[in-house]
């Protein structure tokens, strides 16, 4: 298991992106939309497959009737680091062997990307959103970092 990405949330994508770009001095690349959660993102590639994600609710998305991941429905204030996500293999086994409720494993797709991720029904990760989410990338899918310019 290793850290896959850090998520920086904002009330809108422009704010979150600007925060990262002005803080680090690097331009982010366009990510995409997560239709299932009504969110969208931009990405910044780092070393060794690690990347940063600016994420927010997508105002043009369809209304959903369940909580969004990363507790974005309750996000307010300035952009900030809100979550970290660990890349793992055998995500179902990890969920069974983790002593806290990390949520259910959901299959997610976006463009050419396919992955499984732990998602809690209330959208809040354990320990008030401080515990990591777990992600397992589909072996037949590319990893986002492979298409990102590295900084």
Regions found by a protein language model. Name each.
Residues 10, 61-65, 140:
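Short, functional N-terminal and low-complexity linear motifs
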Residues 10-32, 43-45, 52, 68-151:
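Vicinal oxygen chelate
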Residues 12, 48, 58, 88-90, ...:
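Non-catalytic surface loops within mature trypsin-like serine protease
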Residues 38, 48, 78, 128-129:
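A short, structural micro-pattern
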Residues 15-71:
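Glycine/small-residue-rich interface belts in oligomeric ring/scaffold proteins
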Residues 1-6:
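Extreme N-terminal starter segment of soluble prokaryotic enzymes
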């Amino acid at each position: 298991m290793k850290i896959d990405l850090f998520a920086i949330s904002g009330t809108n994508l422009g704010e979150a992106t600007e925060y990262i770009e002005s803080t680090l001095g690097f331009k982010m690349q366009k990510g995409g939309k997560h239709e299932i959660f009504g969110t969208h993102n931009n990405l910044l590639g780092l070393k060794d497959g690690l990347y940063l994600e600016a994420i927010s609710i997508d105002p043009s998305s369809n209304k959903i009737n369940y909580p969004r991941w990363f507790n974005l429905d309750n996000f307010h204030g300035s952009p900030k680091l809100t979550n970290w996500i660990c890349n793992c293999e055998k995500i179902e086994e990890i969920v069974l062997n983790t002593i806290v409720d990390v949520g259910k494993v959901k299959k997610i797709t976006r463009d050419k990307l396919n992955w499984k991720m732990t998602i809690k029904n209330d959208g809040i990760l354990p320990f008030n959103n401080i515990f990591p989410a777990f992600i397992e990338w589909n072996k037949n899918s590319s990893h986002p970092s492979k298409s990102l310019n590295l900084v």
